[in-house]
């Protein structure tokens, strides 16, 4: 499935192939990750980026009347890797070697890369919190909330990012965030 979606592609040789590790997700499905602690993470210069503190997030949300929670579908895998980084993300599977064309879990820099990317995309969006793949939008009135939400959705669409509609919630008096 990942190959058909262009997330990974088969290759013949790699000096960086990492073994795979299956991770059970909250919904019971399996996520395949590379065990990069044995390869890439040992030698890579780890990218850092400040992650917002919970206090900062709640300061943005304070006074919000209603809240909209936005969930991206396979969030990391929507971020395209540059060409020269791809060979380092190779995984070794029972079906052969595959390199990632998209950001993947297990790479030590992935959370920082993702946070920076999302904050850059949503820069200028008012009353909006981004904590990795958790996006929350509010406003002190319905009109303000809808304007803020429209701004966020337009920027996500402009960046080509897809939502997981089943996990999104709009205009609610309260939502679970960071839970």
List each language-model region with its residue ranges:
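Retroelement reverse transcriptase polymerase core
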Residues: 1-179
């Amino acid at each position: 499935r990942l190959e058909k979606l262009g997330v990974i592609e088969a290759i013949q040789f790699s000096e960086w192939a990492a073994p795979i590790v299956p991770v059970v997700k909250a919904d019971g499905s399996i996520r395949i990750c590379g065990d990069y602690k044995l390869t890439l993470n040992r030698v890579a210069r780890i990218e850092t980026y400040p992650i917002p503190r919970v206090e900062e997030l709640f300061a943005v949300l304070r006074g919000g009347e209603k809240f909209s929670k936005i969930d991206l579908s396979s969030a990391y895998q929507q971020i395209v890797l540059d060409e020269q980084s791809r060979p380092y993300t190779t995984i070794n599977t029972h079906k052969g070697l595959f390199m990632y064309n998209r950001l993947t879990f297990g790479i030590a820099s992935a959370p920082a890369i993702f946070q920076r990317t999302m904050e850059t995309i949503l820069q200028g969006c008012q009353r909006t919190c981004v904590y990795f793949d958790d996006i929350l939008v509010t406003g002190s009135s319905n009109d303000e909330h809808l304007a803020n939400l429209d701004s966020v959705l337009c920027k996500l669409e402009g960046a080509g990012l897809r939502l997981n509609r089943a996990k999104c919630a709009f205009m609610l008096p309260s939502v679970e965030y960071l839970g």
